[in-house]
Amino acid sequence: MNPKRDTEFRLKLSAGFLEEAEEDMRLSRWRSCVDNAQMAAENAAKAVIAMRGPVPKVHELHKALSRLSKNVRLSGLSRDFTALSEITEKLGFEEHIRTDYGDESQYRTPWEIFDRESAKEALSLARRAHDIAGRIIEQWPQEEKK
């Protein structure tokens, strides 16, 4: 485990998925946009988690972020941790399942579930997650030294 390299790797993954989500939005591929936005947000959160330990192989990260934020002196970053946790909860496991499998109980395919508005919202959340993760990564080590 190399926290610095793991963090950089996850942030690059987040940027790549975010770029694909942006392209999907331009091409009106709503389901694909939400799917890539979910992965961008997930990897942004995993980049933050990687700073302090192993990255869990799960899609639900809000609990890990919450635990991490309680164990470290954060001062000005606590709002960022809260916001990132909320985003990963909204774009978590359920959204991941819906983009890949749809809603089996209602017999709705992923292409029937997602529209322009849901793609726009997911993309906005993914952008925020990526920006927040970058800010935490930039500022947190300095916070730790105090």
Q: Which stretches of residues belong to each language-model region?
A:
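Terminal alpha-helical segments
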Residues: 1-146
